[in-house]
Amino acid sequence: MGAMSPWHWAIVALVVIILFGSKKLPDAARGLGRSLRIFKSEVKEMQNDNSTPAPTAQQSAPAELPVADTTTAPVTPPAPVQPQHTEPKSA
């Protein structure tokens, strides 16, 4: 009872033809075919991109970088902050 018989498929096809018309169906099928073709080519391109790693530049030994001046001026600690005592105002 769950499977569709050929009569069910015929009725579905007839309803689709009536709803969309015989002129729009070939255009819709053509558009669907183009979309699937584009989708397949994009998937194939993504698979090719993932399987072949991108060519990397030659990794030669890094040239010696000039050493920056590492001496710094002595740091003086900040002056301690004394909390301000505020007395509650009497009303």
From Swiss-Prot:
List the protein's name.
Sec-independent protein translocase protein TatA
**Which UniProt keyword terms apply here?**
Cell membrane, Membrane, Protein transport, Translocation, Transmembrane, Transmembrane helix, Transport
One GO term of the cellular component aspect?
Answer: TAT protein transport complex
The protein's topology relative to the membrane is: Single-pass membrane protein
* Transmembrane spans: 1-21
Coiled-coil residues: none
PANTHER family noted in UniProt:
SEC-INDEPENDENT PROTEIN TRANSLOCASE PROTEIN TATA
* Principal cellular location given in the protein's record: membrane
Q: Which GO terms describe its biological process?
A: protein transport by the Tat complex
Quote the function comment for this protein.
Part of the twin-arginine translocation (Tat) system that transports large folded proteins containing a characteristic twin-arginine motif in their signal peptide across membranes. TatA could form the protein-conducting channel of the Tat system.
Q: Where is the composition biased (Low complexity)?
A: 51-74
* Taxonomic source organism: Rhodococcus jostii (strain RHA1)
Q: Where in the cell is it found?
A: Cell membrane
**MF-aspect GO terms:** protein transmembrane transporter activity
Summary of subunit composition and partner proteins:
The Tat system comprises two distinct complexes: a TatABC complex, containing multiple copies of TatA, TatB and TatC subunits, and a separate TatA complex, containing only TatA subunits. Substrates initially bind to the TatABC complex, which probably triggers association of the separate TatA complex to form the active translocon.
Start and end residues of each stretch annotated as Disordered? 44-91
